[in-house]
Amino acid sequence: MSEDRLELLLELAKDDDPQARAMAVMGLAKISDPRGFAPTLVTLFDPVDEVRMAAATALGVFGDDRAFEALVQGISDPSARVQENCIWALGQIPTPRSFDKLIELVSNGGLPASGLEDAPEGAEATYSVANRATAATALGERASIAGSDLATSDECIERARIALLNAIDEYGGGDDELAALVSASVWTLGHLPADKQTTGVVLDLLEDEHEWVVRYSIEALAHFGDLAAIEPLEELAESEDEAIRELASQALEMLH
């Protein structure tokens, strides 16, 4: 990497053109020079949504724990896309507190999905279902990173599993918004080692009315390798839905 390129990107990060600033922080993350971290962090507070979105993604690429507080603050950003990118970035930071924050998000801060009405005394806010779904997905991506806590720590795996199963337990079917959280939770469970409880929960979701809940459930069951899934998957292999038929057939091939 040339010094000239670094200097150019550092200058562009302060450019009057928002698109230039956004491209600059992504460029700084790509070259991974430590000198690019601080300017990227500053741009997370840019007045333009597009720039903040890029900065959040870039900070995830850097994976530097010094961005933790700013990214947590970004979860309250006025832009939902910035919130989403900040949560994704937290999933890329390989430290215990970033993992803890993702668990907190998936778990709704320990509060019920219904909000404050049934919340413990002193509770002030809940996380949006969309952000909880993003956090659930971020856990799955984290589990795919070689050497990460979710790839190596039994304690972290169990904490994630409990949070994801509890999120699924809030779902009574029919709620489109919660279905997105369930889909994300099942997708991530498919990246974790299975146990009988998880397999049972996912098997029940094969009958859900939302296609993506069913799709990710099929994929997770194929990963789990539990032969209890064979019979229900054989039924889905006869589904009228072509995509479901193909997924179920592929899962059966993996289980046989």
Over which residues does each language-model region extend?
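Helix-start/N-cap signature of alpha-helical segments
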Residues: E124-N131, S153, G174-L181
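Short inter-helical turns and helix N-cap capping residues of alpha-solenoid HEAT/ARM repeat scaffolds
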Residues: D16-D17, P47-V48, P78-S79, G109-G110, ...
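Residue-level detector of extended alpha-helical repeat arrays and alpha-solenoid scaffolds
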Residues: R21, R52, Q83, R132, ...
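Eukaryotic acidic, Ser/Thr-rich intrinsically disordered low-complexity regions
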Residues: E234-H256
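Amphipathic alpha-helical scaffolding segments comprising HEAT/armadillo-like alpha-solenoid repeats
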Residues: S2-L12, D33-F45, D64-S76, T95-P120, ...
